Amino acid sequence: MAQKLKLEMVTPAAQVLSEEVDEIAAPGSLGQFGVLPGHTPLLTTLQVGEFSYRKGSDVYYLAVNWGYVEVAEDRVLVLVETAETQDHIDLARAKAALGRAEARLRELTPADKEYHNMQAALQRAMVRIQVAGRGGRG
C-alpha cells in the first residue's frame, strides 16, 4: 500500500492540481467523505462545496462546483466544473454574488424557473466566502 495519494483535479479550462497528498476530504452528493491511501475503489459525484487535501501538517482548501471523483488504487481523479484555491477567490466579488442571490431569491418562489439556479448561485457564493476566509493553510 502506498503512503501517498496522487491527486489530480481537472476543470474544462485547465488542470488545477497534480500533487502527492496524504488525504483528501470532498463534498460528495451524499455527504462529506474522506480518502486515505489504500481506499477502496470508488466513483461518485460531488456537489458544490469545500474540497481539502493534506500534505504533511498543511491543509489546503478549494471551492469546487459539481463534478465527479474517481478513486482507483492510490490515485484520486477529480473532474469538476470549477475549482478555486483560497488565493484565487475575490472575497468582495463573492460577497457581492451572495448579496445578489439573496436579493433575487426574496423575489422568487420555488415554482419560478430561476429559483433553483439562484439557490445554486447562493450556495456557490457561500462556499467561496468560506474557503476564502480560511486565511491561508489550515
UniProtKB/Swiss-Prot annotation:
Protein name: ATP synthase epsilon chain 2
GO molecular function, one term: ATP binding
Pfam name, any one: ATP-synt_DE
Domain of life: Bacteria
PANTHER family documented for this protein: ATP SYNTHASE DELTA/EPSILON CHAIN, ATP SYNTHASE EPSILON CHAIN, CHLOROPLASTIC
HAMAP family, per database record: ATP_synth_epsil_bac (MF_00530)
Compartment(s) where it occurs, according to its Swiss-Prot or TrEMBL record: Cell inner membrane
